[in-house]
């Protein structure tokens, strides 16, 4: 008895999109179904390594493609792991994968439908060419079942009492009238060669061949039998010849079904790299990754000696949509042992920061019966991992030699490089050479750290950088002024991960990396030193007064020679968070608040003795004292504007807004009390405004 199930809502939407699509490259359905068949074969082969009896239901691991022109069906059959009834219900309809929604969003945004495999929903591409799909599946742990749907919102599942398929899955596509081209032998061969030539299992196409065979000619025999009844003329000489008379035959055409292997090519990684064309690498990359674009770069190498393995590593042109999804298992490197697929889930084979690299590794030394647990402990795996990282870095360095290629690479994977600097202490310095940043001297282009070093003036000891939310924000920062005056270049770090990377890197080619939003010592001449000491002495009283007014809001107030145009700014201590890091940490939903209070910045309020505002404020404090209302108001306003310009947020934005509004009112000669101003005669308005202007700043608190 067939059971009817409803498709999950998102899958129904996806099917509707696929059925009504106008995409011309519908051939990708075959790539997806063959790829799924290969995955199913991988699974049963892996299980059989620990339990050989799993293959008792069929040792021949293969994929068959069977076109039937008479019934307009195309069948793709594998001898893989097969699906239980529960698998059929869940995998083909009721449970949406994480990629379903993302794929629909990508489709509606104009992405190509050939991306479907990357989102884990490749099976549904069958509906590009079929109006009805039947799936027959047999798993070792369950009976044989049939799944069937015309994608109308529901699907049926029933026990299959027909011929047993042993183990595996048979997908029967009932083709649309306009898609019967996919029943032609030449078309199927073309699509398989293009997309699936490097699948690890043999793909057999069932082709009908017409041959001529000789069969007994029964009609001729009948005629001869009739001749026997006629009177015989005796011939003595030919007695022996008559005895040896052969039966008569005729030639007839017979149609036989033959199996033709479509992917006889041996594994590409076992071949000499010099014999492999770029087209072959591109075809292999696409079959490996489900990408519809060619790769950006490839590294094909073998390691020999105490340890032997071959590998091919590919760098894609784009970052995948789920590159930094922590819960998703990364299966970009397929591990083989002596050409036998073991797993694509060997997390220890490649570090997380390299998770965008795709490829295969084929080891001669690992045991075939490896479990995922023993993989993690295996010493050979550690050596393979070290070599993969080394070769990947060589590949990135090669890409860097071509600016156009490297720009594409860096746009897509700069975050991975920075994550590598943060996590991989051994390769930190090599990775640092790949970093690119905008700077005060680079214009619209980005500069490398090596190029920065070549431009450093002789008297510059350190390399300087500033962190912030955007290039627009940091390029106007008051912290840049004194360094620009000295001709020192400053790097702009505006990616949230930049600061994490720099705190681990610390130095480059012997030069210390310095964050100019934190306390640091700026190179100075003897004359500059004398001037600074004199100004510190002169403004020491003002600094103490401002500290008293601001209290615990700042750790200290200092006279600064690092500010030029701005009257004041707020710098943080060497060991706490910078303003930028504080902003990033506050945005973390699951942040540790106790850690935040411990690490939050110790603020230093810097005042510039060169600023007319500070000079005037000094006189005001000396004349009226630090407790004067106007002094307190001015100091508070200067502090809050410094917070903003230095990259911090204001804790009480309403109070800040009120002070700004009072200042605006003062500039416009407006009365503080609008109702009173409205009641006053027009002639008195000017007098009221004039009186207000003298008192307004005193009331700004």
Swiss-Prot record:
Short sequence motif named TPR repeat-binding, residue ranges: 697-701
Membrane-spanning intervals of the chain: none
GO molecular function, one term: ATP binding
Entry-linked InterPro entries: HATPase_C_sf, Heat_shock_protein_90_CS, HSP90_C, Hsp90_fam, Hsp90_N, Ribosomal_Su5_D2-typ_SF
Protein name as catalogued: Heat shock protein 90 homolog
Ranges annotated as biased composition (Low complexity): 677-691
Organism (species): Podospora anserina (Pleurage anserina)
Localization, UniProt: Cytoplasm
Gene: MOD-E
Pfam families, A to Z: HATPase_c_3 (PF13589), HSP90 (PF00183)
Keyword field: ATP-binding, Chaperone, Cytoplasm, Nucleotide-binding
NCBIfam families, alphabetized: PRK05218.1
Family (UniProt): Belongs to the heat shock protein 90 family.
Gene3D superfamilies, A to Z: 3.30.230.80, 3.40.50.11260, Heat shock protein 90, C-terminal domain, Histidine kinase-like ATPase, C-terminal domain
UniProt note: domains: The TPR repeat-binding motif mediates interaction with TPR repeat-containing proteins.
Annotated stretches, region: Disordered: 212-257, 676-701
Keyword Coiled coil in annotation: no
